[in-house]
């Protein structure tokens, strides 16, 4: 079974991603990982950190000469600002002189005014911390860089095993008019990444930028909605047999686990709930090579399984909780009214969030693909996929042949 985990703190020495269960023979390089990490840094409205943050990628294990080995894959993303934070984030106790110097450092000042909407408050109480630093270091969205690194391996596997492409775009930011056109195709990805807000429509882009400019002027932050599309998936990934095996639930759990994501929908999602049944589902018709559909309201999933249509997943991101116009809070050191701590932050990170949602969708799809088709090498997995696809085609073919004979 494909598994992944990340480790590291926002200002620590490095982030680490560990991927276990990937087959041998998948071609992926550190350059590809770095390219995906660069996409995560894209977006109008990002903060000052993006100007100097660099993701120094080192593959520690599991890949040799650009090909996976079948063992655990470990990827390190170094923190180029580590020298500034080494004393604050040191793993071992400091010597008395260094500890005394750190005592007077602004970087080490206790953070006792939790930010509404962040993990600070509950984390401090749950783990018994007097300072929010241990909470925010791990809760920070900086951790998603490690997920993107892991997801790069999953994307490479999906492309090489199934020909699947996973891409995303921003649907709306703040109160901007949402994009309501057809989903993008792989050939559109370069243009989307070239957009400062990763929009798939020029008018939508202008509306989103205007929202960001207004929020920046007001000292505020913005959320938004992103959509991920996966193209080329076969019928039958996932299962109807139990709740945890339904692909819907797996995707929703993975995407909701991203920092600041507060809602997930598959296909037309909540809009479907407002329709009558006759207008909510995707009717099927006989085609030359099997079943065809005129709509994709279900977003490629029915009964917890892929149905051969493009997968569409949307995620809603809340506004960033580190608000320049600081919100009211309580100083947990004194119990007094206070304003929340404020560190440098983005006005809007929705374009970057779209890339992270891509990552989590790719990881889940790679996992269910390996659960379905197995194999120790990419070649073996491909053989299993090809045999399954022939079987599916054969099940549809008799009906198609019968229609041809009748015609």
From Swiss-Prot:
Primary gene name: aroC
Signal sequence residues: none
Ligand binding (NADP(+)): 40, 46
Function recorded in the entry: This reaction introduces a second double bond into the aromatic ring system.
GO terms of molecular function: chorismate synthase activity; FMN binding
Cofactor requirements of the protein: FMNH2
Record field: compositional bias (Basic and acidic residues): 275-284
Protein name: Chorismate synthase
Reactions that this protein is recorded to catalyse: 5-O-(1-carboxyvinyl)-3-phosphoshikimate = chorismate + phosphate
Complexes and interactors: Homotetramer.
Organism: Mycobacterium ulcerans (strain Agy99)
Sequence similarity: Belongs to the chorismate synthase family.
Listed Gene3D superfamilies: Chorismate synthase AroC
Pathway(s) annotated for this protein in UniProt: Metabolic intermediate biosynthesis; chorismate biosynthesis; chorismate from D-erythrose 4-phosphate and phosphoenolpyruvate: step 7/7
GO cellular component: cytosol
Lineage, uppermost ranks: Bacteria, Bacillati, Actinomycetota, Actinomycetes, Mycobacteriales
Cofactor-binding details, from the entry: Reduced FMN (FMNH(2)).
């Amino acid at each position: 079974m494909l598994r992944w985990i990340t480790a590291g703190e926002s200002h620590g020495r490095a982030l680490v991603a560990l991927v276990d269960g990937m087959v041998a023979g998948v071609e992926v390089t550190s350059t590809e990982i770095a390219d995906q990490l660069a996409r995560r840094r894209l977006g109008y409205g990002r903060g000052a950190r993006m100007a100097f943050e660099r993701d120094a990628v080192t593959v520690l294990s599991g890949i040799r000469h650009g090909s996976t080995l079948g063992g655990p894959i470990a990827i390190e993303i170094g923190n180029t600002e580590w020298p500034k934070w080494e004393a604050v984030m040191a793993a071992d106790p400091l010597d008395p002189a260094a500890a005394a110097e750190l005592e007077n450092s602004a970087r080490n000042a206790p953070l006792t005014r939790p930010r509404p909407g962040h993990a600070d408050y509950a984390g401090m109480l749950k783990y018994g911390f007097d300072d929010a630093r241990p909470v925010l270091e791990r809760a920070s969205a900086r951790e998603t860089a490690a997920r993107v690194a892991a997801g790069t391996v999953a994307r490479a596997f999906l492309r090489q095993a199934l020909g699947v492409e996973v891409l995303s775009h921003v649907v709306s930011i703040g109160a901007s008019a949402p994009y309501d056109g057809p989903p993008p195709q792989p050939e559109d990805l370069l243009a989307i990444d070239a957009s400062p807000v990763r929009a798939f429509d020029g008018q939508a882009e202008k509306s989103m930028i205007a929202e960001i400019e207004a929020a920046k002027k007001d000292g505020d932050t913005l959320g938004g909605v992103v959509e991920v599309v996966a193209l080329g998936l076969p019928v039958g990934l996932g299962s109807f047999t139990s709740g945890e095996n339904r692909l819907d639930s797996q995707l929703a759990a993975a995407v909701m686990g991203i920092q600041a994501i507060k809602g997930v929908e598959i296909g037309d999602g909540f809009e479907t709930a407002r329709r009558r049944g006759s207008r909510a589902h995707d009717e099927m018709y006989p085609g030359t090579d099997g079943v065809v559909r005129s709509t994709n309201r279900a977003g490629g999933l029915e009964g917890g399984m892929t149905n051969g249509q493009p997968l569409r997943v949307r995620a809603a991101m809340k506004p960033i909780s580190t608000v320049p116009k600081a919100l009211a809070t309580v100083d947990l050191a004194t119990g007094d009214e206070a304003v929340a701590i404020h560190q440098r932050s983005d006005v809007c990170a929705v374009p970057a969030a779209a890339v992270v949602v891509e990552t989590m969708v790719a990881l889940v799809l790679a996992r269910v693909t390996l659960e379905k088709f197995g194999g120790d090498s990419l070649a073996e997995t491909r053989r299993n996929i090809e045999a399954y696809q022939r079987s599916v085609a054969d099940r549809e073919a008799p009906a198609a042949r019968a229609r041809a004979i009748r015609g």
